[in-house]
Amino acid sequence: MLAIKTLNQFYGGSHTLWDVNLDIAPGSRMCLMGRNGMGKTTLLKCIMGLQTVRSGGIEFDGNDLTKCAAEQRARLGIGYVPQGREIFSQLTVEENLRIGLGVRKNGPRTIPTRIFDLFPVLKKMLNRRGGDLSGGQQQQLAIGRALVLEPKLLILDEPTEGIQPNIVHEIGDIILRLNKEEGLTVLLVEQKLPFARRVASEFCVLDKGRRVAAGPINDLTDEVVRAHLSV
């Protein structure tokens, strides 16, 4: 579904991603891991067209993403939940959700009822401003907004950051449910090991912009954690 091939990226004069290769199969749940500042968010931004790629390729469902504008990538079926959520605090919950409808390739211009099935709190707070929601509720709104697209691939950048434990568990349940019931492919950046081990089927570790370990989540051993993830 998603193939990243020998990807290199620079930020100013700094070489931030070095010959990164990553294949994400349809229906998989890939967790991108690494210490802070190792290139995880940069890689997601390259996939979404928010950072330029110096060399290498990114293919999604047979499409060369390096030749697609950022909004075009969403229309191809990629939902994106950025770090920090980036909801519109002055807009209502409903207005935030409707923003996603504008880039849907096909289908009705109405919020899918599935969103409220997954996140009942959003239905109760439709007319509340996004800025009035708690951090956990805002994260649910950000995920809901991405799912309005009915994507094939959902990308989440640290979805548990700053979220209360009960909401973290709910988000994990929803990711697993969407994957099992709808075959949704998931790529997430995550720092919390218990969450990663619960939700992911596969992992990839970046260290100083290089891929240093990858495989089934059961291969995420204590040795790998000590070498590349421990602070």
Annotate the PLM regions.
Residues 33-35:
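The feature captures the beta-strand-to-loop junction immediately N-terminal to the Walker
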Residues 129-133:
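Conserved ABC ATPase signature
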